[in-house]
């Protein structure tokens, strides 16, 4: 397996830019900057796309512009066009059940209530893609989930989320090389609670 497509989940537009639900977009923006990518709107892919090279591997970066709950349409269109299999896709998304400051990677699994993943699984008809889960924490009983994810994190939470994103960027080359055991261990060592 070699990752050929990295998708950051989020909602398009200025109103959503700094919301917790957009950490996937934040990751893709930072990765594009790191590898000299320049996002362009591609209507046939229902998103913004750029191509980067990591270790001579061409990798498509995608930020769907379909809004979170319809992300699968965008992912399917680019995967079909470039003939990318599900196990060659890494989806980066916010994760309620992980504390801010923590990032985890895994293959497969359920959508865990995440509507972007739920739609992607439905459209692709598989769970066999990789996920980079960026912890945003859970509001508990303080706030409805939708209000929590569609809101900006506190300064402390933002610092921790940014740290998890930076740690994830540092291991992306190992992700591309398929050194997932190393990635898992490295991310565990860098957890900030």
From Swiss-Prot:
A GO biological process held by the record: rescue of stalled ribosome
EC number annotated for this UniProt entry: 3.1.1.29
Superkingdom classification of source: Bacteria
Protein location: Cytoplasm
Residues annotated to bind tRNA: 16, 67, 69, 115
Keywords for this protein: Cytoplasm, Hydrolase, RNA-binding, tRNA-binding
Coiled-coil parts of chain: none
UniProt-recorded Gene Ontology molecular function terms: peptidyl-tRNA hydrolase activity; tRNA binding
UniProt site (Stabilizes the basic form of H active site to accept a proton): 94
Entry GO terms, CC: cytoplasm
Catalytic activity entry: an N-acyl-L-alpha-aminoacyl-tRNA + H2O = an N-acyl-L-amino acid + a tRNA + H(+)
Active site residues per record: 21 (proton acceptor)
Broad class of the protein's primary localization: cytoplasm
Annotated site, Discriminates between blocked and unblocked aminoacyl-tRNA, chain positions: 11
Family matches, as HAMAP family: Pept_tRNA_hydro_bact (MF_00083)
PANTHER family to which the protein is assigned, alphabetical: PEPTIDYL-TRNA HYDROLASE (PTHR17224:SF1)
Quaternary context: Monomer.
Role summary: Hydrolyzes ribosome-free peptidyl-tRNAs (with 1 or more amino acids incorporated), which drop off the ribosome during protein synthesis, or as a result of ribosome stalling. Catalyzes the release of premature peptidyl moieties from peptidyl-tRNA molecules trapped in stalled 50S ribosomal subunits, and thus maintains levels of free tRNAs and 50S ribosomes.
Assigned protein family: Belongs to the PTH family.
The protein's name: Peptidyl-tRNA hydrolase
Organism listed in the record: Vesicomyosocius okutanii subsp. Calyptogena okutanii (strain HA)
Record gene name: pth
